[in-house]
Amino acid sequence: QHFAAFVYFGKYGREILETLFETHKFVLPQWDFSIGLGSDILTTLHFYAIGDPLDLLSIACPAKYAAYLYSLLSLFRLYLAGLSFGAFCFIKKQNHVSSITVGSLVYVFTLFGMFIVSHHPFFALPMIFLPLLLLGVEQIAAGKRPYLFIVTVFLAAISNFYFFYMLALFTAIY
């Protein structure tokens, strides 16, 4: 169902862009009878695709190549989670590259991470955002500019409200 939403979101985005460039009108289709027995597009896709910034790439991908992009993005989410965890470790002055690499691999390839990405790929977003939020908190505590924190809060908030709530709780506990 996530893949079908990914493909539909790409088609939906291309339709919006075509309308914008051909008629010079910004029109968001609101209802589609091909979703179940008919459903609101934005509400349905918000859970599956609209909140994930990486899913915007589906707009540029033809439907016949969507399976490749979907699989690649699933792996890329894990890669980004490992990078964000590694960045957090480097800022915390863990200078042993081998330790950080092993820690990042353990963080990414836990059973939770593998299960989530294979079943619900956008659930990997909190694994990306949490280390970045904590890194932003560390930068603010060190008196540096809060841009990383602000951008990460923005991305987490538009991605999924529930994830944002949980990330805010974990950040407050930190």
Language-model-detected regions and their locations in the chain:
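Membrane-interface coil-to-helix junctions
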Residues: Q1-A81, L105, F109-M127
